[in-house]
Amino acid sequence: RQMCIRDRLYALRAMGHGDDLIIADTNFPSDSVARETVLGEVLRIDASAAEVVRAVLSLYPIDTFVEDAAARMEVVGAPNEILPVMQEVQTEVSAVNGPAAMMPIERYAFYARAKQAYAVIQTGERRFYGCFALRKGVVPPDQE
C-alpha cells in the first residue's frame, strides 16, 4: 500500500528538527486543528495509526533531545490506561527509538500542542484515543 504520496512527502521533508507531526484518529478535529498548523491544511492517509507511524518513522527519526518527542493523548478519566491502539503505536516507536514509553498528554493540552505542530495527518483509525505526536529528530548524513 502506497501511503506517502507527494503532499505527505513534501510535508515530512519540509519539517525541521523539533517540528511536531500529529497522527490523528478519525474522531480528532483534524481539519479545524490543521488550519492552525504551519502547513495549514489536513493531510489524510486511510490506514491505521500504527501503519502511518511506521511509514513516517521509515522517513525520519524521532527527536532524542527531549522526553516528550513521542506522545499520546491520555484517556479521559484514566490517564495511565494503555489501549490496544496505543500499544501498537508504542511498538512501532520502540522498534526505531528503543523502549522509552510515549509521554501521556491530557486531551486539551494535546489539542494545544497539535495546533502548534507542523502538520496533522488524519488516519483511518477508528478506535478511540488513536492520537499521537511525533517530534522530528535530526536526519543524519548518508554513510560515506
Regions found by a protein language model. Give the residues of each.
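Short, small-residue-biased leader/transition segments that mark boundaries at the very start
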Residues: 1-5
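Glycine-rich nucleotide/cofactor/substrate-binding loop typically near the N-terminus or early
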Residues: 40, 47, 53-88, 92
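Glycine-rich, aromatic-bearing surface loops/beta-hairpins
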Residues: 77-144
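Short His-Asn-centered micro-motif
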Residues: 24-25, 123
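Short, conserved beta-strand segments within well-ordered enzyme catalytic domains
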Residues: 21-22, 120
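Conserved mixed alpha/beta catalytic, RNA-binding, or beta-rich assembly cores of soluble enzyme
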Residues: 19, 25-55, 59, 63, ...
